[in-house]
Amino acid sequence: MMVPSLSTSISSPALFKNREGGEEGNDGGLEQLQNQVNDLGDLNFNEEGDYNNDQQPTNEEEGTADNELESLMSLVNDNNNNNNNTSGIDDDNNNDIDDNNNNNNNNNNNNNNNNNNKEGLNDLFISSINVSTLLNDLDQLSDTHSHASVSNQSSNGSVRRGYDIKTQRSVGTKGQGGSSGSSPRSNSLRVYRTFPYRGDHHFSWLNNIRDVDSSEDPNSCHNSNNNNKNNKNNQPSSTHDQTNINNNNNNNCNDNEKPIKPNSTNGIRHSRKYKGLQQLDFLGSNIILPQQQQPQPIEDNQQVVPQPFQVDAESNYNNNNNNNNNNNNNNNNNNNNNNNNNNNNNNDNENNQHPINPVNTQNTQQNVTHSNNNNNNNNNNTAPPNQWSELIESLGYGSQSDEQKTFGSTLDDLNNANSCSDLKDLIVDGISINNETSPSQSQEITDFSKIDNLNKNININNNNNTDSQQPLPSIDVNFSHNNNNNNNDNDNNNNNNNNNNNNNNNNNNNNIQDIQIPYHQNDQDYNIQEGNDINNDNYEIRVSNNDDDNDSSNNNNNNNSKFQENLNLLNTGMGGRICKTDQKKQLSRTITFADPSSILSFFGSIPTDEDQNNNNNKNKNTTTTTTTTNTTTTTTTTTSASAAAQNKLDLLSSLSAGQSSGGVGGGNNVLNSSSTPAIKVNHQHKVTEQNRTSSKISLSTIFPKLPPFTNQQSPPTLSPSKYYYPLLQPEPTTLIRGFSSAADINKRGLKRAKKPMEMEDVYLTQYPLGDDQDSQIALFAIFDGHSGKGCAVAAKEIFPNILLKYIKSTKNENGGKPIYDMRGVFLNAFKEVDAQLSKFEYEGATATVCLVWRAGHQRFVQSANVGDSTAFLSYGNETLFLSKDHRATDPEEIQRIKNDGITLTEGQTRINGLMVSRALGDHFIKHLNCGLSGEPYVSPPISITPFHSHLIVASDGLWDVISGNRAMEIVKVQQTEEKMSNSLLQCAIGSIKAKDNISIIVVTLQ
């Protein structure tokens, strides 16, 4: 049952109708209950509903009250047995909310308790908790029933037992058997406060929104239960009638639509006004419009501003421009077979006439025609000029300000003179701005202000009067226009279905028009040809000398346009006739320079003026003549067919001389250009190539080859792409940035492995190597001894001097040239060190030695090792091996031993008790000829690039725990070399896998 919020409601099981008999006229129980309630009104109840009479009753009064209470309880229990939706009795909690009306009635819209005599009981508002006042209010509700005496009701005799739903036990009065019942107050009347959900005054505005929506939308369906919720005149006497009324209330609704709750908070989400209060499109315009929009007649020359919202597909826009011309264009989609076609587009459905959509040149197929009819003055477009078409036009062709910024003046007059749709795609002297996309998607180039080298500076005049005295050569310009499917133009648009007999326009543009445009300087004309090409959409201009053309042009004309092109467009990929199929991807490399000296050393010194003049004289076979007047300066350069394109510096000098004194002065327009031979162009843009000379830098000068190895032996099987870098790198200030070392005996690991507590690892770091402080060589080595540390310590002492000796000897053999490969040095040094360790017969050591040195402007790193101490070099996100583990289980080592004629047993993992197959010392094993060797593995020399950041050299105690990739990840997150080495050491010591000594060297190269 719906109760107004923050109000007090009363619920009593005894107030409901006794349905045991199933007859509507059986109201005896109700009358008896009402009489008992009237008698209880004389009793004194406190505010909490307890029976606390201040006056002490006498025995007779006490007995009478007990009898009355027992009689009332019997009636309550009787009603509880006959009512299937009775609220339970709770002695401790009086705040339970049991909606008996909702349980009795299956319809939630009308609150009817099937009690015709108590219609207003559910709408009772209780302002206080005074039970006496409540009982009086209940008494006033009984208008149609007469009061019956208590004696008639007491003749029933028995008190029926009730059942408490919550406590799950039977209840009854005293002396009637069963468990003891509750007090009359708890069993008969339940007072509670409802939760504030509906009916609050804060939600009253939702009803107004719903009412307004109902009035605006006649077809909208809303629930009408608000008006009939508590309608007393229409309340049925049974649930069946109640359901019928609810069905009648929803007759105007669809079957799938559910009635909206009157005061539900969902009304905000379901409200049409809330959903579309300010629903805007992507441009911020309100798209909510009235449902009916009357079309307004469109007058001549009237601009229609379209609205940025979607229009029905059936809506058409009619432009009623009636002209007397026989060649009028028709904008509708019907087949017009009349001879005299007018632009009267009749729309059958006038109610759907809405403002048109913005012009979409991609989805609209437009055929461009150039009419030769002199009487055709029709300038109708598919869409009238508006803000959307102007925006698209500006994006496609360039705004007026951009034209003025780029060309110095607008192109409107030039377009009108040439009957051309666009002059953006021009090729002047083999230079063009190619527009590969449709005009609507063309990208305009406005960055001409940054171009220093000018190729053409052309001023076009359209007057026939001339003041020129001497015959000037003409410029033949081949102007080719290619129509694509989505071609846009400022001229008239015709459908292919227009079959006008008097129409002289050729929609397929098969006719080629030759248009002569007067040209100022040297009587040069543009010969513009228009043709159809299915591949490109380009305009090409070719300049040629025509001595036979004696036509003259006018100097005085205000309608002129100049456009500037540059030879740099060829280099930037914007010039020339570039087709999609002709484009090739070019490889590029990034070269970093540390200082300007590196740039000069990379590209070489700047050429002097004498060198450039000598280069220019090779390409010239004629002289340059310069004619200077008081107002203008004209420079003309004649070149041969073999030297069509001159040096950029020569062109700049010639143009700068013309620009210094040239320009528009005294009403005269000046052309400053260099003419080139004619290029025959057909309408399919098949152009013969010119012989052009351009300065090229040899690749060998940019990427010099590395010198050959000092040792002719080929490097081991490693990918050369990761080790050889022919790029010149900037010269760093230092050889390395820093290095750090860390070592630990790892007692816990040795104890787990049951090894002697002895540190057998030795590390070596020397920078610079040798006594020379300017030496650009760094040495980093790890020696891991076995069977003692004597051999490792001895190798550490003698290795640096032996290496330095062989480095000097190798440099002397090469004539003092830098060493790019230390392979020979490593092989000789390891051989001599192993020979000097011959006294260590029963001791040995693994050795991993890394050298970092500078050769010229480059740095190199190279490693050599015997045993299982590994060196790693970072390369970006990769990790490169600089060493190779020599163990008896390695397949390559097994094959090497077999090649030496030594037989190995199947599954052999050690060589005379050693896990390694190569080591320093251990000469008693080497004398046995069982496969142990002292020859090192030498890695290829690696040119250090900015991608090589760290070098890690460590004993097998570290690599038994973590991998090289993981070690590089740990190192790269640290800031200093000391933290890098300590992080690796702690990571290895903390692992249960560590069972050996640990020695680590970390070198930062960048």
From Swiss-Prot:
Q: Which cofactor does it need?
A: Mg(2+); Mn(2+)
- What keywords are assigned to this protein? Coiled coil, Hydrolase, Magnesium, Manganese, Metal-binding, Protein phosphatase
Cofactor remark: Binds 2 magnesium or manganese ions per subunit.
Q: Where does Mn(2+) 1 bind?
A: 784-785
Q: What EC number(s) does this enzyme carry?
A: 3.1.3.16
Q: Where is this region: Disordered?
A: 1-119, 146-188, 214-269, 312-387, 459-513, 525-563, 604-642
Q: Give the source lineage, highest ranks first.
A: Eukaryota, Amoebozoa, Evosea, Eumycetozoa, Dictyostelia
**Compositional bias (Low complexity):** 77-88, 100-117, 220-234, 244-254, 316-387, 482-511, 552-561, 613-639
Positions of the PPM-type phosphatase domain: 744-1005
State where composition is biased (Polar residues).
1-12, 146-158, 466-481, 525-538
Stored PANTHER family: PROTEIN PHOSPHATASE 2C, PROTEIN PHOSPHATASE DDB_G0279461-RELATED
Q: Which GO terms describe its molecular function?
A: metal ion binding; protein serine/threonine phosphatase activity
Q: What is this protein called?
A: Probable protein phosphatase DDB_G0279461
Reactions catalysed, semicolon-separated, are:
O-phospho-L-seryl-[protein] + H2O = L-seryl-[protein] + phosphate; O-phospho-L-threonyl-[protein] + H2O = L-threonyl-[protein] + phosphate
Q: Which residues form a coiled coil?
A: 65-122, 450-516
Q: Which family does it belong to?
A: In the C-terminal section; belongs to the PP2C family.
